Each structure stands twice: as C-alpha cells, then as structure tokens.
C-alpha cells in the first residue's frame, strides 16, 4: 500500500544486514559472547518463557557491554509469524520497552509477514526492518483485540521507543473498526510555517480542524471495517 511506508526502516535493514554478518562470524568463535556491536537472535513461535529468558539475558549482557565501552549496542530480533499467547508476548515487550536496557537499541527484523500477537513484539522495538513483500499488523486476526488488551499495548507504545509508531497506527492494527488517514498538517506561521505528515484517525483530524489547525491534504490508508496490516 502506497500510504504505509512509515513501517519501513531503511536504517534498520542496513543494521540488520551488518549484524547478521558479524554474528555469523562470532558464532564460529564464541557463541556465548556478544558481537562487537550487538547480537542477532532468531525467535520461534509460539513465543514463550524460554524466549523471554533468552532475549532478556542477551539484552542485559549488551547493556553491561554498552556501559563498559560507553557506546550503544544493538539487539536484532527476527520475529516469526505464529500464534502466541498474549501474556507471553506482552511480558517480553514490556521488558524491552522498560528501563533496564537504556543503551540497547532493539531492532525487529521481519523477513515475512507477522500478524497476531507476535506483531506486538515488533511494535515494541525502536526500529522495524521489514522485507518488501511482508506485512505487519492484523493483531486480532480479523477481529478486534479486547479493549483492555488494546489499552495495555497502547501503554507500551506510549513509552516512545519508536517515534514512527503512534496510537492511531497501532489501534488500526488492533481494531478493524478503526480507520487510519495520512494527513498533511500545517504548523507554525509566516516564515516559521512548515508541513508535517502524520498518521491519524479521522476523529483526530476533525478535532485538529475544530481547533483551527490547517489540514490541506488527507489520504486514506485504512478505511473502517478493513484489516489493519501494512507493508
């Protein structure tokens, strides 16, 4: 879909390629030590407690290395499609968006489409690298995620780990009834005037307009009633 490029992360893809090479080289030497810049982990589905233990162990190792060497580290997670229990995915996503690993950048690598609860883990990463023919979303697999679980996921997103992912995008992935629009917003005045592109619901756009904000262009990304899955 032409209006969903906000999910694609060119920098993340480059980082993933670099880290995969370094990890392959290190695996022949010492599989128990992090690479020079980070670690690449391939997760299996369903995601469970073993995955939590694996990811958290590596993330904390990398955080220790980042503090010792006074530089950021990267943890790349290859996330599969599949059916995982909500609490298992949420627990890991909660750790990744928490305060224990401030110097570790989490990158989600999606070589294939990821739907269902596994998509929540990708959304908790700071960067998302997605293959050109893959999609991310449809968290409820055609149905709305229950309201209490939607709010839990949105609380994770609001921690601001990924500045390109906002409530409206995630809500569209969790609730087929939600719509998503690509809106051009005019901010500032006179010489300070500029245009920003934001992804918002039609309700949010109307509120901006009611508040006097100029919205000269709106393009529909997902209509209400459609599944929210983006490339």
Specify the residue positions occupied by each region the protein language model found:
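Bacterial N-terminal signal peptides
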Residues: 10-22
């Amino acid at each position: 879909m032409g209006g969903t490029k906000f999910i694609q992360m060119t920098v993340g893809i480059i980082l993933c390629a670099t880290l995969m090479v370094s990890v392959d080289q290190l695996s022949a030497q010492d599989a128990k030590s992090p690479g020079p810049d980070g670690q690449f982990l391939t997760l299996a589905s369903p995601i469970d407690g073993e995955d939590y233990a694996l990811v958290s162990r590596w993330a904390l190792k990398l955080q220790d290395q980042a503090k010792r060497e006074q530089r950021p580290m990267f943890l790349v997670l290859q996330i599969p499609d599949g059916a995982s229990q909500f609490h298992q995915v949420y627990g890991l996503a909660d750790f990744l968006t928490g305060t224990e690993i401030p110097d570790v950048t989490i990158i989600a690598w999606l070589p294939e489409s990821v739907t269902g609860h596994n998509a929540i883990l990708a959304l908790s990463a700071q960067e998302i690298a997605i293959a050109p023919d893959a999609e991310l979303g449809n968290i409820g697999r055609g149905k709305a995620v229950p309201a209490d679980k939607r709010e839990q996921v949105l609380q994770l997103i609001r921690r601001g780990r990924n500045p390109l992912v906002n409530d409206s995008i995630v809500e569209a992935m969790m609730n087929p009834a939600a719509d998503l629009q690509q809106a051009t917003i005019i901010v500032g005045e006179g010489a300070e005037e500029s245009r920003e592109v934001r992804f918002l619901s039609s309700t949010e756009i109307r509120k901006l307009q009611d508040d006097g904000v100029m919205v000269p262009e709106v393009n529909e990304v997902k209509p209400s009633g459609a599944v929210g899955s983006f490339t």
